[in-house]
Amino acid sequence: MAKHGYSVCINYISNDEAAENVKNQILESGGRCIVVKADVSSAKDVIRLFETVDVELGRASVLVNNAAILMTQCRLEEISAERFSEVLRRNVLSCFLCSKEAVKRMSIKYGGAGGTIVNVSSAAAKSGSPNEYIDYAASKGAVDTLTRGLAVEVAAEGIRVNAVRPGLIYTEMHAAGGEPDRVERLKSRIPLQRGGQASEIAEAILWLATDKSSFVTGGFIDAAGGL
């Protein structure tokens, strides 16, 4: 986003070093960037996050909801109520809270100039992730429904809402599920016969965030290699 002239706010919850590294890369390339440590599943933290952006960067025009957690692989009967609630809180409530604050700033109804919201869902929303992460899949299904409903709700207010559904991507998230090499194990099932890269997902997000997708709202990009 910074390469395309956007001022960027990096939100994070724990990894100070990683956030600062990305910030420094953006600043060194001539971009404008701030970092804000906040738990986006906390209403109080989300309000503080957006108020900080208001003061330091101006009203948000693009929101990318990509906060999510993945827990250890298991069957549904092994998932505790506490785990299920935590996954929904981190993966769905965060999306709701951030979208709520974004709409207040983007909507022409509230004096805004419009904007775009891009939610990062998952191919798991369609597959259900049986025997692995039904809780994660269910949370992403909720993100899909939120995407579609909000897109229609705010379409006449200058806001577009879309989502990207990544498939098997080489990220650190698989380690959280207990299988760092999961993509390697499953890539033969992918029609393109390989796992995806985070940079490929970023390109899909960028397209939805910019005016290049100006006639697209309530839509989904399945970036899953054919799955």
Where are each of the predicted segments found?
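The beta1-alpha1 cofactor-binding region of Rossmann-like NAD(H)/NADP(H)-dependent oxidoreductases
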Residues: D16-E17, K37-L49, A81, S199
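Catalytic loop of short-chain dehydrogenase/reductase
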Residues: I69, G112, V118-A142, T147-A156, ...
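Short C-terminal tail/terminal secondary-structure segment
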Residues: Q73, I205-L206, T217-L227
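Substrate-binding pocket helix/loop in short-chain dehydrogenase/reductase
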Residues: C74-L76, S80-S85, L186
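Alpha-helical segment proximal to the catalytic Tyr-Lys
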Residues: K104, V152-E153, S214
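Short, small/polar-rich loop/turn modules that mediate ligand/substrate recognition or access, typified
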Residues: A155, R160, V216-G218
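A conserved structural motif in NAD(P)-dependent oxidoreductases
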Residues: I190-I201
